[in-house]
Amino acid sequence: MPLPDFHVSEPFTLGIELEMQVVNPPGYDLNQDSSMLIDAVKNKITAGEVKHDITESMLELATDVCRDINQAAGQFSAMQKVVLQAAADHHLEICGGGTPPFQKWQRQEVCDNERYQRTLENFGYLIQQATVFGQHVHVGCASGDDAIYLLHGLSRFVPHFIALSAASPYMQGTDTRFAPSRPNIFSAFPDNGPMPWVSNWQQFEALFRCLSYTTMIDSIKDLHWDIRPSPHFGTVEVRVMDTPLTLSHAVNMAGLIQATAHWLLTERPFKHQEKDYLLYKFNRFQACRYGLEGVITDPHTGDRRPLTEDTLRLLEKIAPSAHKIGASSAIEALHRQVVSGLNEAQLMRDFVADGGSLIGLVKKHCEIWAGD
């Protein structure tokens, strides 16, 4: 399929996707029939969309195009109410978090969808292992060239986004010692990590043509980069965050990305170059392994900075942009989180350290999601 032309969209508009876990009480393992829930709610959603993701234990909630985080929060709140009622009617529960703490990938059933079945054929068991749950945020752009500039700018802050959203320390019944373990799942994919370097949209079109020769890439949706342009929407899509445990944190993360995008495209503070990515995977690893306690390294100067310190610096820089787009509440909430030194991964570990079981942890996550 050829790459579509870049659809011009209103700059800084917002779209958010949340991949949710569908679980069976009282054991709280993943359920394998999200199709039943989708059928139950499809005529009751007035804004946004509830749809499939890769496997039958995943339920995706997606907003429409929103002007700001308040509109997105309203849509999510309405969807949440409908989905929770349908889940209760079918004796199921819903929760966030980047990984199910004790699920077995071998049990996961890929959705009966042509694209997902083709992906299963291409990638085999990797697709079943990819039953992990993330938050994706789209930001509108006026042109393809703006999208490429924004993608490179946002890539500088991938460690910050990962650390702030970290919510997957447990996998296969084990403490992984990572703050988010979810990003590691994609390391075997040939398109894992950052997009290959291009400097403008014309070069991106050439890149996509080259990738399509592999026969594994039929559309932009087949690319698993940390951040990717979405020409059919006219957006840049950030894909590195775990699904948070609460709607409020999901909205705050979206506000952070929207405000950062506004700052990047209005101030143009960087002259991007390929060398910017020299230490990308090392800095990304620091955020995954240590969360906010990680240390990132500047590829140009060799300077090393605590991620906590650099995140506070970012929040300060984007505060005026956040004010202009109505996202100040998100930046203030994230500032409090950074100062506290906590993320959701640490809260999960604290629950287990206090004697809680992993089954009890998932039960707690369901209560948190329903109560937010």
From Swiss-Prot:
Which keywords are on file for this protein?
A: ATP-binding, Ligase, Nucleotide-binding
Instruction: Kindly state which reaction or reactions the protein catalyses.
Output: L-cysteine + L-glutamate + ATP = gamma-L-glutamyl-L-cysteine + ADP + phosphate + H(+)
Known InterPro entries for this protein?
Answer: GCL_type2/YbdK_subfam, GCS2, Gln_synth/guanido_kin_cat_dom, YbdK
Metal-binding among the record's keywords? no
Report which superkingdom the organism of origin falls in.
Bacteria
Top class in the EC scheme = ligase
Please, one GO biological process term?
modified amino acid biosynthetic process
- Which Pfam families does the record match to this protein? GCS2 (PF04107)
**According to the UniProt entry, what is the EC number of this protein?**
6.3.2.2
Q: Recorded GO terms, molecular function?
A: ATP binding; glutamate-cysteine ligase activity
Subunit structure of this chain's protein: Homodimer.
HAMAP family per the UniProt record, alphabetical = Glu_cys_ligase_2 (MF_01609)
Return the similarity comment: Belongs to the glutamate--cysteine ligase type 2 family. YbdK subfamily.
Q: What does this protein do?
A: ATP-dependent carboxylate-amine ligase which exhibits weak glutamate--cysteine ligase activity.
State the protein's name. Answer: Putative glutamate--cysteine ligase 2
Tell me the organism. Shigella flexneri serotype 5b (strain 8401)
